[in-house]
């Protein structure tokens, strides 16, 4: 999982989720796209 200052969708399969005040991008098909903001 990459930690970035700004997270963006990289493909149509990406889902943006907020958990515990953090923003995550989650992708089940291509796990390389997983990101966390902060």
Swiss-Prot record:
Keywords for this protein: Ribonucleoprotein, Ribosomal protein
- Where do transmembrane segments lie in this chain? none
Q: Name one GO molecular function term.
A: structural constituent of ribosome
Keyword Flavoprotein assigned = no
Q: Does the keyword Ribonucleoprotein apply?
A: yes
PROSITE patterns given in the database record: RIBOSOMAL_L36 (PS00828)
- Known Pfam families for this protein? Ribosomal_L36
Per the UniProt entry, what is one GO biological process?
translation
Chain segments annotated as coiled-coil in the UniProt record: none
The GO cellular component terms are:
ribonucleoprotein complex; ribosome
> Of which family is this protein a member?
Belongs to the bacterial ribosomal protein bL36 family.
Q: What is this protein called?
A: Large ribosomal subunit protein bL36
Gene from which the chain derives:
rpmJ
